[in-house]
């Protein structure tokens, strides 16, 4: 098997990929994400995941590079990572009592410029009706500040969620079924290594 490289600095993606039992290294990508803003959410996360994987793959040989990107969309509005506690509070107030969609694109590229595979997952998440005190308390934990949509379902943010429809791991940031399916296309047998 070629060396597996995760093109992400996300600790959540690192933890999730480790669940597959495959050895991998981490090499975060650096791309200009703004050039993809015009694309609809599913196409955007796929394009960004592929761009991230390609950027890292270009500097490697004999490696499979996994890229990913996640967006939160509510009522047509894309919610990225908040840039301040106040922005996080505004996002959470907006999400309160609503259903939003989490999209994660996943791409695998055979380095340096070999075959590529890309897909995405989509999960609907419904928030509870949140009080201003609940929002303030959650923001005070610091948890929402580095996450798209200003919450982490795998942490205390789970208390904000009334329900989900779809892949939980997608909401965390890496849909493992799609990752396994893409890696299988490149000859990686996750089941044989667990």
Swiss-Prot record:
The active site is at residue 69. It is an enzyme of class 3 (hydrolase). One of its GO terms (biological process) is nucleotide metabolic process. Its EC number is 3.6.1.9. It catalyses: dTTP + H2O = dTMP + diphosphate + H(+); UTP + H2O = UMP + diphosphate + H(+). GO terms for cellular component: cytoplasm. One of its GO terms (molecular function) is dTTP diphosphatase activity. Its main location: cytoplasm. Pfam families: Maf. Signal peptide: none annotated. Keywords: Cytoplasm, Hydrolase, Nucleotide metabolism. It comes from the Bacteria. It is found in: Cytoplasm. Its cofactor is a divalent metal cation. The record marks 12, 70, 154 as: Important for substrate specificity. InterPro entries: ITPase-like_fam, Maf-like. SUPFAM superfamilies: ITPase-like (SSF52972). Belongs to the Maf family. YhdE subfamily. Nucleoside triphosphate pyrophosphatase that hydrolyzes dTTP and UTP. May have a dual role in cell division arrest and in preventing the incorporation of modified nucleotides into cellular nucleic acids. PANTHER family: BIFUNCTIONAL DTTP/UTP PYROPHOSPHATASE/METHYLTRANSFERASE PROTEIN-RELATED, BIFUNCTIONAL DTTP_UTP PYROPHOSPHATASE_METHYLTRANSFERASE PROTEIN-RELATED. This is dTTP/UTP pyrophosphatase. It comes from Moorella thermoacetica (strain ATCC 39073 / JCM 9320).
């Amino acid at each position: 098997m070629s060396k597996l490289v995760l093109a992400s600095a996300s600790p959540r993606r690192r933890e999730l990929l480790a669940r597959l039992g495959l050895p991998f290294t981490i090499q975060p990508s650096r791309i200009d994400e703004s050039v993809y803003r015009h694309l609809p959410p599913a196409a955007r996360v796929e394009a960004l995941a592929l761009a991230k994987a390609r950027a890292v793959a270009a500097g490697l040989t004999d490696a499979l590079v996994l890229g990913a990107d996640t967006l939160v969309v509510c009522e047509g509005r894309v919610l990225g990572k908040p840039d301040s506690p106040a922005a996080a509070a505004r996002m959470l107030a907006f999400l309160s009592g609503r259903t939003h969609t989490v999209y994660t694109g996943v791409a695998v590229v055979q380095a340096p410029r070999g075959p590529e595979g890309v897909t995405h997952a989509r999960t609907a998440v419904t928030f509870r009706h949140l009080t201003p005190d609940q929002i303030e308390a959650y923001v005070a934990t610091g948890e929402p500040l580095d996450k798209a949509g200003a919450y982490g379902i795998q942490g205390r943010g789970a208390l904000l969620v009334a329900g989900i429809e779809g892949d939980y791991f997608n909401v965390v940031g890496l849909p493992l079924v799609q990752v396994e399916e893409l890696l299988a296309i490149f000859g990686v047998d996750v089941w044989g290594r667990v």
